[in-house]
Amino acid sequence: MATEIFYDADADLGIIQGRKVAVIGYGSQGHAHALSLRDSGADVRIGLPEGSKSRAKAEEEGLRVLTPAEASAEADLIMILAPDTKQRQIYADDIAPNLKSGDALFFGHGFNIRYGLIKPPSDVDVAMVAPKGPGHLVRRQFVDGKGVPCLIAVEQDASGNAQALALSYAAGIGGARAGVIKTTFTEETETDLFGEQAVLCGGASALVQTGFEVLVEAGYQPEIAYFEVLHELKLIVDLMWEGGIAGQRYSISDTAEYGDLTRGPRVIDAHVKESMRKILAEVQDGTFAKEWVAEDEAGRPNFNKLQDQGNAHQIEEVGKKLRSLMSWTQRP
């Protein structure tokens, strides 16, 4: 099936301009969505708890700030951009009691819908708009007259117009300037979780730590090991990001490329691929979601233990020392 990609010419910005939008949350994505929608002519309000530290920031940026319940009652399109683990409670306490027939419930990630943690009534639209970039980039690109590609999906089309509404919303945050790709809640959620677990976060972190351990255990200086398996990773990832794997290989030495082509498959071998398939299966059948929800509800004991173990790894101490020598790695 051919991928469907939409652009500004395919979107009707007037649709989102005619809605009352509530953005629940004002973190990385929340601020980018709210400010860009406002600048696109939409009627936007923010939903935050009374004690939220983000309330002052949102008000300083000229946005109306209400409680999540008040914002939901006032709006006819509610975008939930709170953390995954908090969405179910926010929905039950503040949104569900204020949902009206014909409203639209939007998400920036499909987790809670895909795994049935939130079950909207049948008379509301349920859709997703997910920019493929962090909030600060979404906002900066919008202000510069550009955009970050977005995914859109429709889970429930009560109005018969949910896709057009999602596309209009995506255009309102600049996504249609770059391209809006149609997907499903299932595809977005499962590929996102798999990517995080097997490659981007879990896979990369474990690969780097294990490579560091192999070098140090073989008698090499930890500082040298850090440079070779962690620090220089950014150089390679940047090359991949700019030109794909082929572009990265074109830019490195022949020696490095030969080692890549002949040794890489020995590290990421058939056994690793089978482990990846098992991880994907746990995402698909809900095993991971059930485990994570139970872990969160129990106070995150295993999460905290594993986090502490990771923070205590030798690579963290070595890295902190070496990064202090490199001013360009320091965040302002």
From Swiss-Prot:
Its EC number is 1.1.1.86. The keyword Oxidoreductase applies. Substrate binds at residue 253. Residues 3-183 form the KARI N-terminal Rossmann domain. Pathway: Amino-acid biosynthesis; L-isoleucine biosynthesis; L-isoleucine from 2-oxobutanoate: step 2/4; Amino-acid biosynthesis; L-valine biosynthesis; L-valine from pyruvate: step 2/4. NADP(+) binds at residues 26-29, 52, 54, 84-87, 135. PANTHER family: KETOL-ACID REDUCTOISOMERASE, MITOCHONDRIAL. InterPro entries: 6-PGluconate_DH-like_C_sf, KARI, KARI_C, KARI_N, KARI_prok, NAD(P)-bd_dom_sf. The gene is ilvC. It catalyses: (2R)-2,3-dihydroxy-3-methylbutanoate + NADP(+) = (2S)-2-acetolactate + NADPH + H(+); (2R,3R)-2,3-dihydroxy-3-methylpentanoate + NADP(+) = (S)-2-ethyl-2-hydroxy-3-oxobutanoate + NADPH + H(+). PROSITE patterns: KARI_C, KARI_N. This is Ketol-acid reductoisomerase (NADP(+)). It comes from Saccharopolyspora erythraea (strain ATCC 11635 / DSM 40517 / JCM 4748 / NBRC 13426 / NCIMB 8594 / NRRL 2338). Binds 2 magnesium ions per subunit. Transmembrane segments: none annotated.
